[in-house]
């Protein structure tokens, strides 16, 4: 290590190698309107024909290290993080160093920072043309974010002050490509709750002597309307349909970043940013695969090393899970669908779990446990739906229930039980039931939580998911 540059000999490349770290973004946009007052409406919109860049303050030493290495080397291997941001970091630096782009020969694409993972990536160096579009995507997004912020933040702020929505002279309404739609969804949700007026409604249900409840979906607007419907019914019912299905449910999907963030928010009240930082830390320590992924699948390569380490994983997290599915299944393993990054899984580099900090330990256990469930048996159950009709009024009622045949992975992961024993009935069977009226109220929408935002809203509107 010579002042931030590592000099090594690579057996794989059969060459001397200089390694220089970018320590994140070294280059940033240079404001094209340094003396431009964008807080005056007549100066908007501001649409530069081209953006220029400059080296950020405080990182010139790292930039010059890279520049010196590039001058000395025969060719360049880009080894930044394998994603849009990593690609952007690399090319923005290279664009500021004359002649460097022509020296780019390979792209290192490492989803794991274990020794084996890095060696494997070096043996499969990619052509830069395969990944450069990630840079173009990141660059286009960066330009769009700048244009939105530089133009719409002052425009919206000025307009809101004109109508008295922003009283303080120094207050600014920030506008962003992702943040503004999210704020809009939260405000809309808040207004729906604030303006919600609960309305009563009535339903009719029919019960047998054991208290088994058959329900009807009709909601009556008044007690009188429900009473009139009830008066048309008799106590006699006929079974008109019995649907029995044997079903099998595989274990939950492997984690991607969003699902892991959602679960950490739900179970431990840890926000999305903190979760990402913790997983990134585990990745950098070589214990976890690449974190910024939206995939819930792995390839056969990962499956094979996971199988080889099953017992070590069990011992590390203290879970005696019965692992019987040792052949890849399409719900978890698909070489064709894993384009760049696979799901978040433990690497073959297994830590002493007691040496991890508290949240690193929690996340490592969660990810490893979810991975082990992939090898467990399916949850098998029998699903039954019985439909009956009132003999006098022809109104239909239904009841559904599941009966567990084999708990499988549910032996290890607690879930809300849906088991409900139903009587053995056949079509045309006659029943005697007691119908009654039940009153209820319409309920306001639930508040948007971080978990709901991450798991449902962001994917639904494709916000901040790439």
Per-range role (PLM):
Residues 96-101, 126, 151, 155, ...:
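A generic secondary-structure signal for well-formed alpha-helical elements
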Residues 80-82, 262, 292:
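Short glycine-centered, acidic/aromatic-flanked micro-motifs in structured strand/loop junctions
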